[in-house]
Regions:
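…; additionally, a secondary subgroup of soluble metalloenzymes is captured
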Residues: 1-172
């Protein structure tokens, strides 16, 4: 996925007058430079302010949010931030990244961090997951949306969960 895809989704949300749009940022640091995430976040925040739609709710490094080797303890940390509002806290996404960089943790390894607790994923929400790589998206998708998930203890959520591609034939 690319930030332009996210901007397109935010623009569509504005056109459709969607309220309460929250972004859960998965930081990269591998396919782009390891410390470039802060510039992407600044660009995103500027765009959201410009169009008047969207707020960053959480940040997580791909090490946690996009695991692909059934390391559920990592995925659980990202899930807990996005759904339960638990984990590291920061007043802003930029502050969270600056703290991570200060601790010598690049974008890939940003600890799941809650920036806006109002953005927790909850029953009745719609989630648009716009990552195009199925291998990196399956586990967090299962944790959030799979009715028979058993990777760690969590409650089943009643969501509309939409992806940009099929991650796995067993996922609905």
């Amino acid at each position: 996925s690319h930030i332009d895809h996210l901007k397109g989704l935010l623009k569509l949300a504005k056109e459709q007058e969607v309220k309460n749009v929250y972004v859960h940022c998965f930081m990269d640091g591998r396919d782009v430079a390891p410390g470039s995430g802060i510039e992407f976040v600044k660009d995103l925040e500027s765009y959201m302010a410009e169009i008047g739609v969207g707020q960053i709710a959480t940040l997580s490094g791909r090490y946690y949010a996009m695991d692909r080797d059934n390391r559920w303890e990592r995925v659980e940390l990202a899930y807990n931030a996005m759904v339960l509002g638990k984990g590291e806290k920061a007043a802003s996404a930029v502050e969270a990244l600056e703290a991570s960089y200060h601790d010598n943790k690049s974008d890939e390894f940003v600890l799941p961090c809650v920036v806006n607790e109002n953005g927790k994923i909850k029953n009745g929400d719609s989630v648009v997951f716009f990552n195009f790589r199925p291998d990196r998206a399956r586990e967090i998708t299962r944790a959030i949306n799979d009715k028979v998930f058993d990777g760690f203890k969590r409650e089943t959520l009643d969501l509309v969960f939409v992806t940009m591609t099929q991650y796995d034939k067993t996922l609905e």
